[in-house]
Regions:
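Short, charge-rich amphipathic interface segments used for partner binding and complex assembly
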Residues: 29-61
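Charged interaction scaffolds used for protein-protein
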Residues: 64-65
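N-terminal acidic leader/helix
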Residues: 1-27
Length: 65
């Protein structure tokens, strides 16, 4: 896995997070269930993005040694 790939994934996650955030701010959830679902997707993407960022940092630190 390359750091460039991890950066690309992180950028895509951030794009999706912004899209979901914008949709939620505009009230696009049809009901409470849809809102909860969007919140779950948002949280999952945040977790995935944090894991990718941490992995990239660890790889960068390994390369610097």
């Amino acid at each position: 896995v390359s750091i460039d790939l991890l950066k690309h994934l992180s950028n895509r996650y951030q794009e999706e997070l912004k899209n979901i955030s914008d949709d939620m701010a505009m009230g696009k959830a049809e009901d409470h269930g849809a809102y909860k679902y969007a919140c779950g997707i948002y949280r999952g993407l945040l977790i995935a993005n944090n894991i990718v960022a941490e992995t990239a940092q660890n790889m960068q630190a390994s390369e610097d040694e």
